[in-house]
């Protein structure tokens, strides 16, 4: 594994379905928002899924993203609080992504992954996204706070996610950033 800047890595990766494991620290938001900001500077359509759109818009403004000037390219997608509702709508949202424009997606997953049923469903969703990824022109970053994944099923779930992604970013406030790509 190589240690480096996560945003630079994502920026140089090209089109890829990426899993981003993190500790939900300030560094996490800095990485996500910097990735979005760089896409907006290139006039790429940037999507951010969240359970709290107003708070994310506020945080983006504080980070230095001009959300009003970039409203044509910045798309904040509200996701349901309950995982069961989320799992139904996310695949529809993926189908709605522009296929001719360059895109960047940060898809946040702040659910409590505390059962194999939830992790199996999430792995199934990720595989569906990956199966249709060739239709997208850009990066799709699936952002997971590792502390929301129950210890007993964490290893199994992480392995399931590796099956449907081409690159992995591990980032913690203490440990920094490690990345690797999969064949």
Predicted segments, located by residue:
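Non-catalytic regulatory/interaction regions at protein termini and inter-domain linkers
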Residues: 1-183
